[in-house]
């Protein structure tokens, strides 16, 4: 059984506090984009969970979130059968686009169908939260306000068909490290989430592009100053606005029209030769 597992961007990311377990309390606007991995799962003749992937640098053992998802799903529903999971990877790794989380989400959804468990999406989200904070959102997809550590999800009016260029530099970032180095007391200006939601409901891409904000830039951009240059180059190439997604290092920019986006894509691909550059669009849902 095969399924597309879509990437996400953060149109807003704010940190407003900390839980006792040191997890940050967040307010985020999440958005699915039309960039995806393909997850293919079949039952195996033994009780093993095996993973294969078209990218050699992706772990195929218990470090992979897809593996963790399969283990948790089997444990939850007392399933003894093994599964073979194939991941066709297109979403960049360690990029702030929930590549691992969306794979885990797809595994839960596929196994739910494959084994005729018929668990509700809410139950799948509860399992997903044990894997990672982004997994519940990846099960739901679309345009959403995510709060708590990301598990409290409020669907928003779809903000679809917006053109964007996405650039993932040739290095990864540790999400854990970024959050460890984030000092909430030093956040001078919090994100106007309500203003952004209103603008998105009004389909005002210009306002959204100029007012989107990610407080994690305070950490990642200090360590990787090249990201400032990428944002500036995107703006100079005609972007309405540019921002880092998640903990980074991926930077994305919204564009008014495909021609300007195409020119920016060519320029960025030429200048940042060892980076992954994509043109994509926002989409309504991940169709999970």
Curated annotation (Swiss-Prot):
Pathway: Isoprenoid biosynthesis; isopentenyl diphosphate biosynthesis via DXP pathway; isopentenyl diphosphate from 1-deoxy-D-xylulose 5-phosphate: step 3/6
Superkingdom field: Bacteria
GO MF annotations in UniProt: 4-(cytidine 5'-diphospho)-2-C-methyl-D-erythritol kinase activity; ATP binding
Active site feature: 8, 134
Keywords carried by this UniProt record: ATP-binding, Isoprene biosynthesis, Kinase, Nucleotide-binding, Transferase
Pfam families on file: GHMP_kinases_C, GHMP_kinases_N
Class of the enzyme per the UniProt entry, highest EC level: transferase
GO BP term, pick one: isopentenyl diphosphate biosynthetic process, methylerythritol 4-phosphate pathway
Signal peptide range in chain numbering: none
InterPro entries: GHMP_kinase_C_dom, GHMP_kinase_C_sf, GHMP_kinase_N_dom, IspE, Ribosomal_Su5_D2-typ_SF, Ribsml_uS5_D2-typ_fold_subgr
EC numbers for this chain: 2.7.1.148
Positions that bind ATP: 92-102
Catalytic reaction(s) noted: 4-CDP-2-C-methyl-D-erythritol + ATP = 4-CDP-2-C-methyl-D-erythritol 2-phosphate + ADP + H(+)
Protein family: Belongs to the GHMP kinase family. IspE subfamily.
Function field: Catalyzes the phosphorylation of the position 2 hydroxy group of 4-diphosphocytidyl-2C-methyl-D-erythritol.
Protein name according to UniProt: 4-diphosphocytidyl-2-C-methyl-D-erythritol kinase
Gene: ispE
């Amino acid at each position: 059984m095969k399924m597309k597992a879509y990437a996400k961007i953060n149109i807003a990311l704010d940190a407003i506090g900390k839980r006792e377990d040191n997890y940050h309390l967040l307010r985020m606007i999440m958005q699915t984009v039309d960039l995806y991995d393909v997850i293919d799962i079949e039952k195996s003749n033994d009780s093993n969970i095996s993973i294969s992937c078209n990218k050699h640098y992706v772990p195929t053992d218990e470090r992979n979130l897809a593996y963790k998802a399969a283990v948790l799903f089997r444990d939850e529903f007392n399933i003894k059968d093994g599964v073979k999971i194939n991941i066709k990877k297109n979403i960049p790794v360690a990029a702030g686009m929930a590549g691992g989380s969306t794979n885990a989400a797809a595994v839960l959804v596929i196994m739910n169908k494959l084994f005729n468990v018929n668990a509700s999406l809410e139950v799948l989200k509860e399992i997903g939260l044990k894997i990672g904070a982004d997994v519940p959102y990846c099960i739901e997809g679309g345009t959403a306000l995510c709060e708590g550590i990301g598990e409290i999800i409020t669907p928003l009016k779809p903000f679809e068909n917006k053109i964007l260029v996405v650039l993932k530099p040739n290095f990864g970032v540790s999400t854990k490290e970024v959050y460890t180095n984030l000092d909430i007391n030093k956040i001078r200006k919090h994100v106007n989430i309500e203003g952004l939601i209103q603008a998105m409901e009004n389909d005002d891409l210009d306002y959204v592009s100029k007012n989107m904000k990610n407080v994690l830039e305070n950490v990642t951009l200090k360590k990787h100053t090249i990201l400032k240059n990428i944002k500036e180059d995107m703006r100079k190439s005609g972007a309405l606005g540019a921002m880092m997604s998640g903990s980074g290092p991926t930077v994305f920019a919204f564009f008014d029209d495909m021609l300007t986006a195409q020119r920016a894509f060519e320029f960025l691909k030429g200048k940042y030769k060892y980076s992954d550059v994509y043109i994509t669009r926002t989409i309504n849902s991940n169709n999970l």
